Amino acid sequence: MVEKTVVVRPELCVGCMQCMIRCAEAHSQSKSLFAAIGEAILAKPRIHIGVGPEQKPFPNKCRHCEPAPCQEACMPGAIRSDIADGLKVVDQARCIHCGMCSMACPYYVIRYYHDAKAPGGRSIAIKCDGCFERLEAGLIPACAEACKTGALTFEDVNAVQKQGTDRLARAAYGVVRS
């Protein structure tokens, strides 16, 4: 069960794309922005800034759904959730580029990129992995660390849900009991 997650507050996003840059850097072989630019296979971001309502920037990333439609649609079983805290990750060695996961994802966050290291040099599915390697090292996800506006934060799921419930109650009734 996920206890902490990257919370997206699109109203605070300014579209600077620092989250995308830091995500790609965190998934590069060198883990260094300047060295990553020169790598033979360029790292790809797992978060993307799209256009949301009213033509405003919207940070879009995997929600690590439970149950996950992408995982259920993946015929070779390349999407698994046995990594820390139920994060859904793609086993790139098993991905056959059938596209089923991408079609099943309700948030359109699974992208396909060419990978010369994959068998036959084919394309593979890439999606947010929750920066599980950074979490294991005691760090927060790269996108949340990079975001200076607070549009992406790494927070306790239960606390965020309570804040949302309280905000709705205030809007509807004007008061909230503690």
Listing of model-derived features with the role each one plays in the protein:
Residues 1-178:
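Non-ligating segments of multi-cofactor redox enzymes
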